[in-house]
Amino acid sequence: MLSVILKESVRNLGKAGMVLKVKPGYARYLLTQKKAVRATKENLKSLEEQYLFIEKENLEKLEAAKVLKASLEDEFLIITRQAADDGKLFGSVTPKCISKLLSDKGYNIHYRNIFFYSVIKYIGEYVVNLELHPDLVLPITLYVVKNDLGAMQAQKLHAEKKRKIEEGKVEKGSCTEGESLELGSVDNDINSGNVDSNESEKQDSVSE
């Protein structure tokens, strides 16, 4: 175990300024992402002074996260996966998959800052949560489809939902997790391909 001082609050770990012992692999992640510094004698001695700097840096990161949030708010993701006739996926969708999709769009978000409220097991519509900052989490829509035709229909579905949101007919983020395949013929068509967290985090940790 390695001792570190958190430079910012980290979900499920601790608040900025805390001195914690973490596993070497996780310590490397925290240090590389500049979320922590080593808890050396010098750093511990100047912790109070460091804390003032940490607070200032944390506020700057929060402002940067707000800018990123503004650019991401209209984004949605589509991922293609093989599935059985009932829509059950043969593979899996993990935070690393989402991180790659976002990277392809020009957004650098580490997979550890991506989480789901439920495991993605079926074709359909889901909500993915992006932790842009410990105090700022942005939910975005993910469509899991079987083929290009399904991707086209997902784009059409999202455009229709956006129109209804703008007209005030539905609330933003109104997708119910795990029920997207039961919303009607459009999602059923995505499931069939005729038209157009958690367990996932455990899978990612094993693959490291």
Curated annotation (Swiss-Prot):
GO cellular component, one term: ribosome
Superkingdom: Bacteria
Record region (Disordered): 168-208
Keywords recorded for this protein, A-Z: Ribonucleoprotein, Ribosomal protein, RNA-binding, rRNA-binding
Biased composition (Basic and acidic residues): 199-208
Calcium as UniProt keyword: no
Gene Ontology biological process terms, A to Z: translation
Gene Ontology MF annotations: rRNA binding; structural constituent of ribosome
NCBIfam families the record matches: L9 (TIGR00158)
Entry protein name: Large ribosomal subunit protein bL9
Annotated source species: Ehrlichia chaffeensis (strain ATCC CRL-10679 / Arkansas)
